[in-house]
Amino acid sequence: MSPIENSDSAAWRELEAVRAEAAALRRQLADSPDRTRELEARIDSLTIRNTKLMDTLKEARQQLVALREEVDRLGQPPSGYGILIGVYDDQTVDVFTSGRKMRLTCSPNIDTSTLSYGQTVRLNEALTVVEANEYDAVGEIGTLREILDDGRRALVVGHADEERVVWLAGPLAKVAEEDDLDDPDSPVRKLRPGDSLLVDTKAGFAFERIPKAEVEDLVLEEVPDVDYSDIGGLGRQIEQIRDAVELPFLHKDLFREYELRPPKGVLLYGPPGCGKTLIAKAVANSLAKKIAEARGEDAKEAKSFFLNIKGPELLNKFVGETERHIRIIFQRAREKASEGTPVIVFFDEMDSIFRTRGSGVSSDVETTVVPQLLSEIDGVEGLENVIVIGASNREDMIDPAILRPGRLDVKIKIERPDAESAQDIFSKYLTEDLPLHADDLAEFGGDKAACVRAMIERVVDRMYAESEDNRFLEVTYANGDKEVLYFKDFNSGAMIQNIVDRAKKYAIKSVLETGSPGLRIQHLYDSIVDEFSENEDLPNTTNPDDWARISGKKGERIVYIRTLVTGKNASASRAIDTESNTGQYL
């Protein structure tokens, strides 16, 4: 082949190669967008994986830090606690800890000016104060005897009557820095002898006052709203107690002029339900109003205090507790009386706690309780505005030393109401304001006053009639004599109120059943029958003579009782001699 042909052949080959390369470039150029998108997608995927790896690494690092902190926390030495008892300007404090008094350094993070005596503080292993906490909320209970002159310390009595002087912590201690200690909102001024305090005897601090229901429930301070006009059938007894109580308070100058000593106390005795407690409350109310009038003050703003002592609840199984409660009661009375306010200390069921010494069957508590009361009553001699009133239905069981002149000077018997007194009592509950039945009103020409008076007269005649239906008991005396007692012999103001309430309930039921409103005399008659029949089973006692004494029947000893009730639910008469159930007293 000629050189020219060879040259052409090489050129053609080179041209074909160029064409092939151009075609390849064209194909690559055509495929480049797809490749770019593929690479971008891969980059996005790698970015997401990288982000997840970074989050995982960060979380692992945080867990590692938390675990390291937990390891460090678990490896810390234990902290101690103490009670702050002193603060100094050089960032040091006195702390009572582990039974020792120590002077320690405070952490720079603690502002010592904000610390208070008695506050709990936390200590590190180097005994440095690193944290201030609250005051102790648990501890022993002590009884406040008195607050010392500096106002920051108090004398408290602990177990076994052990006396101890303690600091007043927290809000109690702040009062010492105040100028006006008579501020009624001051915590210390609210403290009074007999209060229970939370005490740490080792550190010597009292933290707060703890209300104890056992004492607060025994002494109920109140201003009674009972007036003499609310009491019926006891005009003579009210006059007696007004002479004994109100005259010495209202006319002190005359008593001093005649050298007459006011009575220290009054005993109200008589059967249950006859108004002894009502009279005592009315005395406190009336006395406050009279003194307010004498001072030129508004009678509506008159103040008096009626300390109602629940006799049986005063008893306590622990030795010395009952006597302590009695001391608290009279301390409270002296406190109130020192303000110039009349104070009535009323002991209800006095025979339950102040029995004749030596008469106890299972205990001899009265041998110490009675002398405690005697000393307190004698202590009232130099104290104004206080009088003791006792109430009992077994005055024969009260220790004679309490009843002697000079202690409970005045003794007033609250007897069961007679027919006239019963009418007076009924008039307190049956008034013209009550809705009366049209038929009963028509009998008196629509005169409500006349209708009410007639109702009262008829119901009293029914109650006090010595009829067969009103026979209650046949008693046999030790000498063999027998006597029939009627329901009128056991009537009381409480029974009269119950009869009227029963009649009102019958009137309400009558309205609901018949639609005819108003109280009728028949409702009262039905109430009397039901009241009498319910009392049939009440004189159940192992000792008929004791039951008779409580019920107000005195005289010859009773050895046998037989019921004679013939009401609508009664059957044959029933003898009562040695019943096992004591039952409720009339």
Swiss-Prot record:
The keyword Coiled coil applies. Homohexamer. Assembles into a hexameric ring structure that caps the 20S proteasome core. Strongly interacts with the prokaryotic ubiquitin-like protein Pup through a hydrophobic interface; the interacting region of ARC lies in its N-terminal coiled-coil domain. There is one Pup binding site per ARC hexamer ring. Upon ATP-binding, the C-terminus of ARC interacts with the alpha-rings of the proteasome core, possibly by binding to the intersubunit pockets. Residues 585-586 are annotated as: Docks into pockets in the proteasome alpha-ring. Belongs to the AAA ATPase family. NCBIfam families: pup_AAA. It comes from Nocardia farcinica (strain IFM 10152). One of its GO terms (biological process) is proteasomal protein catabolic process. Consists of three main regions, an N-terminal coiled-coil domain that binds to protein Pup and functions as a docking station, an interdomain involved in ARC hexamerization, and a C-terminal ATPase domain of the AAA type. One of its GO terms (cellular component) is proteasome complex. The lineage of its organism: Bacteria, Bacillati, Actinomycetota, Actinomycetes, Mycobacteriales. This is Proteasome-associated ATPase.
